[in-house]
Amino acid sequence: MKKFRWVALVVVVLACLLLWAQVFNMMCDQDVQFFSGICAINQFIPW
């Protein structure tokens, strides 16, 4: 039962990371000033 809880936790964390990646890509496409630094870093991370 404990193993299932760990798997669920990992799945939720991965889903959140994917969601953040999508949000970052959207913001980068719109060229938001605040995200420009993050976008520069984001290009080096293979999403």
Swiss-Prot record:
Keyword line: Cell inner membrane, Cell membrane, Membrane, Transmembrane, Transmembrane helix
Compartment(s): Cell inner membrane
GO process terms (BP): negative regulation of phosphorelay signal transduction system
InterPro entries cross-referenced by the UniProt entry: MgrB
TM annotation in the entry: 6-26
Gene Ontology terms: cellular component: plasma membrane
Pfam families xref list: MgrB (PF13998)
Membrane-topology descriptor: Single-pass membrane protein
Chief location category: membrane
Function: PhoP-regulated transcription is redox-sensitive, being activated when the periplasm becomes more reducing. MgrB acts between DsbA/DsbB and PhoP/PhoQ in this pathway. Represses PhoP/PhoQ signaling, possibly by binding to the periplasmic domain of PhoQ, altering its activity and that of downstream effector PhoP.
Family (UniProt): Belongs to the MgrB family.
Subunit annotation: May form homooligomers. Probably interacts with the periplasmic domain of PhoQ.
Record HAMAP family: MgrB
Listed name of the protein: PhoP/PhoQ regulator MgrB
Record organism: Escherichia coli O127:H6 (strain E2348/69 / EPEC)
Gene: mgrB
